[in-house]
Amino acid sequence: MAKLYEAVTFKDVAVIFTEEELGLLDPAQRKLYRDVMLENFRNLLSVGGKIQTEMETVPEAGTHEEFSCKQIWEQIASDLTRSQDTTISNSQLFEQDDNPSQIKARLSTVHTREKPFQGENCKQFFSDVSFFDLPQQLYSGEKSHTCDECGKSFCYISALHIHQRVHMGVKCYKCDVCGKEFSQSSRLQTHQRVHTGEKPFKCEQCGKGFRCRSALKVHCKLHMREKPYNCEKCGKAFMHNFQLQKHHRIHTGEKPFKCEICGKSFCLRSSLNRHCMVHTAEKLYKSEKYGRGFIDRLDLHKHQMIHMGQKPYNCKECGKSFKWSSYLLVHQRVHTGEKPYKCEECGKGYISKSGLDFHHRTHTGERSYNCDNCGKSFRHASSILNHKKLHCQRKPLKCEDCGKRLVCRSYCKDQQRDHSGENPSKCEDCGKRYKRRLNLDIILSLFLNDI
């Protein structure tokens, strides 16, 4: 009996899958297997025992791309070198209810490579019942361990422990390239693909590549056009529940993400992150041709399309072309007459949210854009940009009829209407026509004030 309590090496009691057995698992299941192996090993360290550091044999790596046996054992070996303990007794490796014959039988299967346990789904044989249970739970989808914070369920307690790092804010994994930290190794691996440009997950329908499987799943729903989540207020449909929850903030006005520097609030965390780069002046994306920096990749792409002159989105009604599908969508409302954005003050409708926001300032009198040179205030960012050109005497546009230099495109249009006599803005009450829509709006506002 005393012999059963002698010290042994970790490999004497560890049971691993062969490369053939690992070949039956997809990358996510292989990662879970690795995490379970590492978690079990760390649990052995945590009970205060000791483990011998010698690793006499390491299984050869197979042809699998992710997490071969060799990689798993190398991870365990690295943990061993960080540990100050060196041995653990057999009495700590097994449950108290195990009798000597059960312990002896379990150890003997490792040395003899006997595999008495067969999986019902995969028909593979395993040397230990605990590893027989691993694929059984993977196939059955049983998730008995639930997170108290968010309610998410997991097959294994070790997977739950890894998930709980997200709530605790523990970030053990650091990117060697940019220094960004992550709570899970899988998230670090996905992030590293940003630097390498690797996109291993391909769409079978269009061939588009993605860095992670979840992004591919979202993309595939675009082909299926499946949008099961509907907004009760406006009827807009979404592919995912989290998209619907974000959309609800438009109706409620909730802005939970606040900038610590200037106090500005945002509906989305991504919008806050983008805004914070304005304060840090961090522009990660550079134009190779012109050297101009941008906060995110989308802005760089928009800038490049300006120089290339690409306008792939065409209106079927009038033939007008646009750089972005969102611009085309807004433009089509001109033809359909749809004005989904309504002013609560006066009931006036607009085809875009930016148009409604601009209109709101006529009611509030807000002029949030101030000129540093003369102190003049403006309602819109584009107005102050055009105004600043007056101070620097910059007039990039030229009238084709008279050659007059002008500050902005709207002034150029006004000048051309002077030559042509065109007055496109018409008052519906009196029939009088105006050169600019702004002039008509001013007259209408004065008329309403008199009433």
Curated annotation (Swiss-Prot):
Concerning SMART domains, the annotation shows:
KRAB, ZnF_C2H2
Q: Which GO terms describe its molecular function?
A: DNA binding; DNA-binding transcription factor activity; zinc ion binding
Cite the entry's keywords alphabetically. Answer: DNA-binding, Metal-binding, Nucleus, Repeat, Transcription, Transcription regulation, Zinc, Zinc-finger
Domain of life, source organism: Eukaryota
Transmembrane regions: none
Q: Which family does it belong to?
A: Belongs to the krueppel C2H2-type zinc-finger protein family.
Q: Where does this chain mainly localize?
A: nucleus
Return the CDD domains for the record.
Answer: KRAB_A-box
The protein here is known as: Zinc finger protein 222
Provide the function of this protein: May be involved in transcriptional regulation.
UniProt entry tagged with the keyword DNA-binding: yes
What are the residue boundaries of the KRAB domain, all occurrences included? 8-85
GO CC aspect terms: nucleus
Instruction: Record the organism.
Output: Homo sapiens (Human)
InterPro entries attached to this UniProt entry: KRAB, KRAB_dom_sf, Znf_C2H2_sf, Znf_C2H2_type
Residue ranges annotated as zinc fingers (C2H2-type) are 145-167, 173-195, 201-223, 229-251, 257-279, 285-307, 313-335, 341-363, 369-391, 397-419
Q: Where is the protein found, in the record's own terms? A: Nucleus
